[in-house]
Amino acid sequence: MLSLVKTAAVVAVVASTALGATIPTFTQAQIDSGEAMRQLGKIAYDTAMARAAKATTGCTADKVKIRKEWRNMTMEDRRGYQEAVQCLMQKPSRYGLPGPKTLWDDYGVLHYYQTPYVHDDATFLLWHRHFNWVLEQDLAEHCGYHGTFPYWEWGLDCGHLDASPLFDGSETSLGSNGAFVKNHRAAIGGAKPGTGGGCVTKGPFANLTVNIGPTEARNPLAYNPRCLKRDLNDDVCRKWASLRNATELVLYTSTVGVFQSAAQGEGVRGDGGHTFGTGVHSGGHFSISGDPGSDFHFSALEPGFYPHHANLDRLHFIWQNLDWAARQTIAGTNTMFNLPPTPNAVLTDNMGFEPLHRNITIQAAMDTVGGTPLCFVYEPW
C-alpha cells in the first residue's frame, strides 16, 4: 500500500506493485506540471502490459488496444473517431420510444435509466469503464472505426479550453465552445461563468441536434430537439480538474472507497487528511458545461462525455496498477448514496447495459487487460 510523507515542497511516495515497481519521490512542481502523472502513468502502463504478456489466451499482449490522449492521436484517428460518432447519430434507436431517434440517443437513455445505480455507489467507476468500452464496440461494429479510443487530460487545457485540440472547432476536434451568452451563470456553484453558454458554432458538431432531455422536463424522454450548447469554463478546470487535482487523487487515496468518493466530490478526506473539493468527475463535466453537458442524467449525449470519462477511468487504471494485488476491490452499495437502502455490492453482481450490450458482472470490468472482455491500456500523454 502507499505511504506518504509530505512537506511544503516535496511529496515522497513509496510503494510496491505486484511486480515490484517503486513510485518515485515527486516535488510539488512535478505534480503541478504533470511530470508526476506521466511517471505514474508509465508505471501503470508497464504493470498492466506485464500481466498481458503472461496471458496465453484472451487479452494477450499482441491484442491490447492502446488508448491515447486526444492530442497524441493521429489526425486520421481524430477524424475517424469523430466521423464514427457522427455515424452513430444516423443509426436508428433500439429503444422504440418516441423521443430517442438514434443509436447515439440510446446512450443518453441508458445513462438516464442507470444514473441512480451507477453514481455515488460501488459501481460508479467500473460501470462507466464498461460504458465507454461498449461505445468503442459500437463505433467499430456499426461505423467501421477501429482506431484509437481517446481520453482527455483536462489539466493540459485548464486556462485555455477554447484552444484545446478537443474543443477548438477545427476539423479534427469535437466542435467548439458555445456562442457567448451575456450575464449567464456557471452551471456549478463556486465558479465564475464560462466563456460560452449558447449553441456550438464551429466544427464537426455545430449542427448537432440533441433529441431528448433535459432531466427537469415534464417528460425527459420525449422528443425535444434543440442545439448542442457548451460553456467552456477555465475557472472550473483550474479549481477541480487540474493536473494537481488528478495527481493528488491518485496519490492520496489508499482505498477504493476514498478514491471513488474523492473523485465525485463527496467531502471525504484522503491520506493525511487531504481534501478534494468538488472532485475531478464534476470538474471535467463542468469544464465543458452546457446542454446536455451539465445534465446529470443526459450528459452522455455530449460528445465530450466519453474522452472525459476515459480520463477518469485512466486515473482509476493508474491507481489500481500502482498496487494491483490490493486494488481489485469495490466499496459501497448498488444505489446512489444508498437511497433506497440496498446491500453492499459484491463482485458477482451484474451491471446493466441492455439493450446496448449484454449485462456483465462487476468483476468482469475490474481489469482493463482481463480479457473478459476488456483488453486495453492507457498510454501516458
What feature does the model see in each segment?
Residues 1-25:
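Fungal secretory targeting signals
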Residues 21-381:
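C-terminal accessory segments of proteins
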